[in-house]
Amino acid sequence: MEFLLQLENILKKRKQDLPDKSYTADLFRGGVDRILKKVGEEAGEVIIAAKNSDKKELTHEVADLLFHLQVLLVEQGLSLQEIVEELHKRHS
């Protein structure tokens, strides 16, 4: 789980620096519409992988979805900590 926090910091830096030849920077340059398109695509791929009962494919696709959700959170100025706090409120 610690890696997700590290990834959040990496994504924030990519958004700030917008390096050339960076897929993540390209997402940020494309704005929220491009990011949302990728989130939607990845969510669909998760559904298909789960429907196919393919654990390896599902692991890969969930990782892609989590990555793109984190990009969306950074774009929207939200942190993983805020999401964790919301989940904690709901389930404690």
UniProtKB/Swiss-Prot annotation:
- Enzyme class, one word? hydrolase
Which UniProt keywords are present, listed alphabetically? Answer: Amino-acid biosynthesis, ATP-binding, Cytoplasm, Histidine biosynthesis, Hydrolase, Nucleotide-binding
What Gene Ontology terms describe what this protein does at the molecular function level? ATP binding; phosphoribosyl-ATP diphosphatase activity
Reaction(s) the record says it catalyses: 1-(5-phospho-beta-D-ribosyl)-ATP + H2O = 1-(5-phospho-beta-D-ribosyl)-5'-AMP + diphosphate + H(+)
The answer on whether this UniProt entry bears the keyword Amino-acid biosynthesis reads yes
Q: What pathway, per the record?
A: Amino-acid biosynthesis; L-histidine biosynthesis; L-histidine from 5-phospho-alpha-D-ribose 1-diphosphate: step 2/9
UniProt superkingdom? Bacteria
A biological process from GO: L-histidine biosynthetic process
What the entry lists under InterPro entries is as follows: HisE (IPR008179), PRib-ATP_PPHydrolase-like (IPR021130)
What protein family is recorded? Belongs to the PRA-PH family.
Q: What is this protein called?
A: Phosphoribosyl-ATP pyrophosphatase
What gene is this protein translated from? hisE
